[in-house]
Regions:
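Zn2+-dependent cytidine deaminase-like catalytic core
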Residues: 36-159
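Short, basic/aromatic recognition patches
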Residues: 1-22
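Gly/Ser-rich catalytic serine loop of serine hydrolases
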Residues: 18-25, 106-108
Length: 159
């Protein structure tokens, strides 16, 4: 099993712990080793000093890494966040059948991408629309498209 598959499987397992409808799981790795894991949480929470309506899995993991690095390096923690890769996947079930578990798109949203960049993270692995893992530098993610989709979601009316 290649590294990408191994990491996506671990993040997929973390997603199972989520109680949200869209289950996202994430891990942080360094030098091929899993450092921590997390999943999305629907509770209003403070992530990286910003209050959010929910905590996205990648931000839960980033918060854990930052907390660990701040303890060790203090204010200089941002000099070390680029050594970690965050992996995030979205797990979904069709027909509520455990056999039909699949990975779906989990590309980080506009806000998560911006926050991760601001904190000095460099790379992220995420499941694409085909359920395959993509590894990309955060600075190469087209946030204009992500922002557009977030704005569309905010203006949609749900009846």
């Amino acid at each position: 099993m290649c590294r990408k598959d191994r990491f996506s499987n671990i993040a997929f397992s973390a997603a199972h712990k989520s109680v949200q409808r869209y289950k996202h799981g994430a891990i942080a790795t360094k030098n091929g080793k899993v450092i921590c894991e997390g999943h999305n949480d629907g509770m209003r929470t403070k992530v990286l000093n910003n209050y959010r309506s929910c905590a996205h899995a990648e931000m839960v993991v980033a918060e854990k890494i930052i907390k660990m690095l701040k303890k060790k390096y203090g204010k200089n923690y941002k000099n070390y966040t680029n050594k970690y890769t965050i992996w995030v996947v979205r797990k979904s079930m069709h027909n509520s059948n455990e056999k039909n578990l699949k990975m779906y798109e989990s590309k980080p949203c506009y806000y998560c991408t911006k926050d991760l960049l601001k904190e000095g993270f460099d790379k992220i692995g995420y499941s694409n629309e085909d359920g395959e893992m993509v590894v990309q530098r955060l600075k190469d993610i087209d946030t204009s498209q992500l922002h557009k989709s977030v704005l569309q979601l905010q203006t949609e009316k749900f009846y």
